[in-house]
Amino acid sequence: ESANQVTIITEQKDNAVPIETRYKRISTIEKAGAICSLLEVRLITGRPHQIRAHLSSIGHPILGDRKYGNKKSLEISKALNIPYQLLSACSVTFPEMKGTFGYLSGKEFIIHQIYEFIHSVFVK
């Protein structure tokens, strides 16, 4: 799964595009002998694969992510029967904007089923 994979670098290069990701830990649990954390992630820039590549580059790959995961995260994913990346939006918030998509300006949409499922696993 190396096709269409991005790389995170720490020094500026000519063709590099900067990214900014903010995250905070919501809760932590132990599963399959590993410490797993639920994160709230906010994209300041929105690049393809940004969350997956950034978290993996700092040693915290997303469970089930065959493209950016490491050996340990993939072993944990297998033990927990997680066949796909455990990454989902619980809400989408649109910035203030005008024009064609102005009707979405400042609106937030919450996906309650995902939110409830994640909290049933991580927040007790």
List the predicted regions and their residue ranges.
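RNA pseudouridine synthases
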Residues: 1-124
